[in-house]
A protein has these predicted regions:
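Structural motif
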Residues: 43-44, 89, 143, 171
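A nucleotide-sugar donor-handling region in carbohydrate enzymes
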Residues: 88-150
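Conserved catalytic-core segment of nucleotide-activated headgroup transferases in glycan assembly
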Residues: 134-174
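A short helix->loop->beta-strand "cap" motif at the edges of active sites that frequently abuts
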Residues: 65-68, 107-109, 168-170
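Conserved N-terminal ligand/cofactor-binding loop architecture of enzyme catalytic domains
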Residues: 1-40
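A conserved, positively charged/aromatic
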Residues: 37, 80-90
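Active-site proximal beta-strand in glycosyltransferases
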Residues: 44-49, 53, 57-75
Length: 174
């Protein structure tokens, strides 16, 4: 409920014309991060979250950051405030999201729909029967993957309740 309200308020405040309270809060960390980046002399910064992207944007605006910033989006929607960031490129989870990001004000030439980087082990194909055996799943049961991030998805318990009410034989893994 709280995160949903935050998203709605963020969508109302969010604009590529003005900065949000989120930007100003994140910019308070710019001085500390500046020292760390100068001390370690990185070639680029890669960030998988909006908050450090906001901090890095504040640093760029002050002339404190001269190295490229790469933002990796891990949401399948344009969350509020990405449009007020100034990253050199944005890795987008999927190409279907490009229109939404462009509409919100992110520059098309800086958007790269390359997916969310994951550990190589997740890309390894396994036979379904072997995967079920490794996970101790019955070979004939329906399998539903219900997962959520830290905010925005909604009520996972309600989704599972709908599956339960559908009268389908399934097993819950927790």
């Amino acid at each position: 409920l709280l995160f949903g309200l935050g998203y709605r308020l963020g969508g109302w405040v969010s604009s590529d014309k003005r900065k949000s309270p989120v930007y100003y809060a994140c910019s308070l960390l710019a001085g500390t991060l500046k020292g760390y980046l100068e001390q370690n002399r990185f070639d680029a910064v890669v960030t998988p979250h909006l908050y450090p992207a906001e901090t890095l944007t504040a640093m760029k605006k002050k002339g404190w950051l001269k190295i490229p910033v790469v933002a990796i989006g891990t949401d399948y929607t344009c969350i509020p405030f990405w449009e007020e960031t100034d990253c050199d490129c944005y890795i987008v989870p999927q190409k279907d999201l490009l229109g939404e990001l462009i509409h919100k004000g992110l520059p098309k030439k800086q958007l790269f729909p390359l997916g969310i980087p994951v550990k190589q082990a997740f890309s390894t194909q396994k036979k379904r029967s072997l995967a079920r055996k490794l996970c101790r799943l019955p070979s004939d049961a329906h399998v539903y993957l219900v997962m959520s991030g830290s905010m925005g998805y909604g009520d996972c318990a309600e989704t599972v309740q709908h599956i339960t009410n559908a009268g389908v034989d399934f097993q819950i893994l927790a």
